[in-house]
From Swiss-Prot:
EC code(s) of this entry: 2.5.1.55
Cellular-component GO terms for this entry: cytoplasm
Catalytic activity reported: D-arabinose 5-phosphate + phosphoenolpyruvate + H2O = 3-deoxy-alpha-D-manno-2-octulosonate-8-phosphate + phosphate
InterPro entries according to UniProt: Aldolase_TIM, DAHP1/KDSA, KDO8P_synthase
Enzyme class: transferase
Lineage, highest ranks first: Bacteria, Pseudomonadati, Pseudomonadota, Gammaproteobacteria, Pseudomonadales
Transmembrane segments: none
Pfam families the record matches: DAHP_synth_1
Gene3D superfamilies on file: Aldolase class I (3.20.20.70)
Protein's recorded name: 2-dehydro-3-deoxyphosphooctonate aldolase
Amino acid sequence: MAQKIIRVGDIEIANDKPMVLFGGMNVLESRDMAMQVCEEYVKVTEKLGIPYVFKASFDKANRSSVTSYRGPGLEEGMRIFQDIKQAFGVPIITDVHEPDQAAVVAEVCDIIQLPAFLSRQTDLVVAMAKTNAVINIKKAQFLAPQEMKHILNKCVEAGNDQLILCERGSSFGYNNLVVDMLGFGIMKQFEYPVFFDVTHSLQMPGGRSDSAGGRRAQVTDLAKAGMSQSLAGLFLEAHPDPDNAKCDGPCALRLDKLEPFLAQLKALDELVKSFPTVETA
């Protein structure tokens, strides 16, 4: 099965290429913290030889509470992203929530992300596709892996085949998510790169009444399980002080654990991709 290669600058993204990291923080809390987080990611990924794209959100539009922190907003967010690109020379990925944001974000960011909750919103999908930017499509918690084909088709029909799929867990009763490991293989059959968002797969949606809970202690176990499926890359959020993060702290890796965490996953990725394919169909 031929695997499609997506190129972002000098980075090649494909299921049979070395793992790529989409990593950063959940939401832009401040310019200084974004710089601190990106600097650590750049240092670690350069040391380990992992291709890297910085991730953060300028707006968290689906918070559980109307009083929860959402981010600096579109204009300030784009200024911070431009500062990060200038300082570190890394590509940027961020999410888009409304059709009229797509073109503005695509002017600054190298990859634009379709949020899981919004992945069936045709107007948003088409607006994002028409930017011709690379799109990271999050699989909704309520969709089966095979249903991602419909979202891919919407993008292609709008003229964009620069697409990535991303698993982020499936609803498992109330306030819980589970990752179906068989789903990775189903999505890989579409031949587009598949990523694993381990951070949000650890969520317990609404688990703290007015915000999501999480299972940070299990991040290494779940990341290893996902990356054993020979994927294009990992989606990860880290924070210098997760217990005081403004969003999704219970799911975030401690920033000072980034190097040992990624070292294990890189070794696993190399091992898995060294194996010959065994046809069992």
